[in-house]
């Protein structure tokens, strides 16, 4: 099959494209290599993907409609996996316009490409942030998404609604995957597990927002890639949660990393940001039933794999700048 994967130089995009290439699929990778975080990570991922002869890369700005629609000149694309986005709750508060352009306009342009090119399947990467500070745990897909706590979450809700519109009017098979805190090797340096491992290894303080009792459903990246690939076979329209199936407090996460690295963390506590969700836990019943998907990694196993990647790439990781 031939897949268009946006955000191919990104964390999840890299792992998803790699998995597809290893199974002899053809990939059109799209990314604009922006400097949202250290581009050395993005370039290193692209270098790995470019070793595959079935990988073709385009440095394309998805907010530019004409550039996106020019992709219709490609030979028949079977499915689009749309991962390119501006991510991050706190960052979106300082520049909401960038999130509107890169998360909403870009999605609209891709949906239009699907329409005019008769691409049958479209998968949108969304986020558990759309649920706001929901108190119902585990959270299923029927929980209302009308009270987002950040422009990031609001932009993803808008992208979801546009995706439904194009399914409804043009019959595009559409899967929306709401990710719960993804982590793993080659991760994003603005995410907590990457930050904590790097800072603890370097004997630098880590910052914990709140008292350490807030919790997240952490999801290992190859589990996410498996869910994305399975979703491209969907007929119809569905929203799925993609989570690890259990919640881990920040305090416990630090202990897991300390045990792995055999080093103690230097901890600084600061007040919890009001845009942060206090607890998250995915109900993954729906995706298990419809796509026959289950996570393979628990938090201890996933952190161990992530830590191994760090220890195997210390020189490279030491050069990576962390993003606040």
Label every model-predicted segment:
Residues 67, 98, 105, 144, ...:
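Residue-level recognition of oxygen-bearing side chains
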Residues 63-66, 87, 187, 248-249, ...:
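Short alpha-helical
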Residues 25, 34, 97, 153-154, ...:
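Generic secretory/membrane-interface signal
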Residues 42, 133-138, 151, 157, ...:
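NAD(P)-dependent short-chain dehydrogenase/reductase
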Residues 15, 40-44, 70, 91-94, ...:
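Generic recognition of short, well-ordered alpha-helical segments
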Residues 62, 144, 184, 213, ...:
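Residues that form or immediately flank small-molecule/cofactor binding pockets and catalytic motifs
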């Amino acid at each position: 099959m031939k897949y268009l994967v946006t955000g191919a130089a990104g964390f999840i995009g890299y792992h998803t494209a790699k998995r597809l290439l290893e199974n002899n699929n053809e990939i059109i990778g799209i990314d604009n290599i922006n400097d949202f975080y250290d581009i050395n990570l993005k370039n290193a991922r692209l270098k790995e993907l470019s070793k595959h002869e079935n990988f073709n890369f385009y440095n394309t700005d998805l907010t530019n409609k004409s550039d996106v629609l020019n992709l219709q000149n490609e030979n028949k694309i079977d499915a689009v996996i749309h991962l390119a986005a501006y991510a991050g709750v706190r960052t979106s508060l300082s520049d909401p316009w960038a999130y509107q352009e890169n998360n909403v306009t870009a999605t609209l342009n891709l949906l239009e490409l699907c329409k005019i090119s008769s691409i049958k399947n479209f998968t949108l990467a969304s986020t558990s942030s759309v649920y706001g500070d929901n108190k119902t745990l585990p959270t299923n897909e029927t929980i209302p998404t009308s009270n987002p706590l950040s422009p990031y979450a609001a932009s993803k809700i808008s992208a979801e609604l546009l995706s439904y519109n194009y399914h409804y009017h043009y019959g595009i098979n559409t899967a929306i995957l709401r990710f719960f805190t993804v982590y793993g090797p080659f991760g994003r340096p603005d995410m907590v597990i990457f930050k904590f491992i790097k800072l603890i290894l370097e004997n630098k303080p880590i910052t914990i927002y709140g008292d350490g009792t807030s919790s997240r459903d952490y999801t290992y990246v190859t589990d996410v890639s498996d869910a994305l690939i399975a979703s491209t076979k969907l007929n119809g329209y569905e929203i799925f949660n993609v989570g690890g199936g259990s919640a881990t407090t920040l305090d416990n996460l630090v202990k897991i990393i300390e045990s792995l690295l055999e080093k103690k963390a230097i901890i600084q506590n600061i007040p919890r940001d009001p845009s942060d969700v206090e607890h998250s836990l995915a109900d993954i019943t729906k995706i298990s039933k419809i796509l026959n998907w289950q996570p393979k990694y628990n938090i201890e196993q996933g952190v161990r794999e992530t830590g191994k990647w760090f220890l195997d790439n210390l020189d490279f990781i030491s050069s990576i700048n962390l993003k606040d």
